[in-house]
Design a protein with these regions (language model features):
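N-terminal leader/targeting segments
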Residues: 1-17
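Short amphipathic beta-strand/extended segments with alternating polar/hydrophobic composition
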Residues: 43-48, 137-143, 180-185
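Structured, beta-strand-rich domain cores
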Residues: 75-141
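Mixed-charge, glycine-accented linear interaction segment located at domain edges/termini
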Residues: 145-207
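Solvent-exposed edge beta-strands and adjacent loop segments
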Residues: 18-97, 145-160
Length: 207
């Protein structure tokens, strides 16, 4: 075992921190509008809450390439192009429609206008899944949403609320980062501030 040069500091023992055995639930969905700077670097505004979370799913994007030799798969590689996702919520917030989708709100009449020239903004998307020990918080850094559809149904003996679904693509950033998530060893300072500011470590991995 390697000698601890700083006896007053305990080595990090992951087993000291509880890990979730199961995952359930979805809550605390937030988004932060991104601005692209020089070299494609993204900077983020203050996170805004997106209430009414019903479900969120992510499907990996990327291809697996296989090279055959000696009558077998000699080499295989997979490209990580991020995720394709869907987010189902109770209702699309007006602020999200204006700030992200690009709809135009007339402040005099209060009428919302969708135009053919509107372009969705890139956002960071944050959310958390609960667990038997502690909720795991996630952030996707380079998300582009598609214009949502709309639908409605007549009332029957029981009223079933209609939800809205957003489709989106979460691509890697120019630094190659797709997603980050908290763990059982995440510091309280980082965990508690997850929805205050988009988490960006000082050291960025090489893409």
């Amino acid at each position: 075992m390697k000698e601890n040069k700083y006896p007053m500091l305990m080595p990090l023992d992951i087993q000291m921190f509880g890990e979730n055995k199961v995952r359930f639930g979805l809550k605390n969905v937030h988004y932060a509008v991104a601005t692209e700077g020089a070299g494609g670097k993204l900077t983020y505004g203050t996170p805004e809450r997106y209430p009414g979370a019903v479900s969120l799913s992510l499907e990996p994007r990327g291809e697996t390439s296989e090279f055959y030799a000696d009558d077998r798969v000699y080499y295989a590689t997979t490209v990580n192009n991020g995720y394709e996702g869907t987010y189902e919520a109770a209702e699309l917030p007006l602020k999200f429609r204006v700030d992200v989708i690009g709809d135009q709100l007339d402040e005099t009449t209060g009428v919302l206008t969708e135009t053919a020239n509107s372009k969705p903004k890139t956002i960071a998307l944050m959310f958390e899944f609960d667990g038997d020990v502690k909720a795991t918080r996630h952030v996707l850094y380079n998300v582009t949403v598609s214009r949502p559809g709309t639908s409605g149904e007549t009332k029957t003996e029981s009223t079933e609320p209609t939800t809205q679904e957003l489709s989106f693509i979460a691509a890697p950033t120019v630094d190659g980062v797709v997603k980050r998530a908290t763990t059982g060893t995440t510091t309280p300072e980082v965990y508690d501030a997850w929805y205050t500011k988009v988490f960006e470590p000082t050291v960025v991995p090489t893409p």
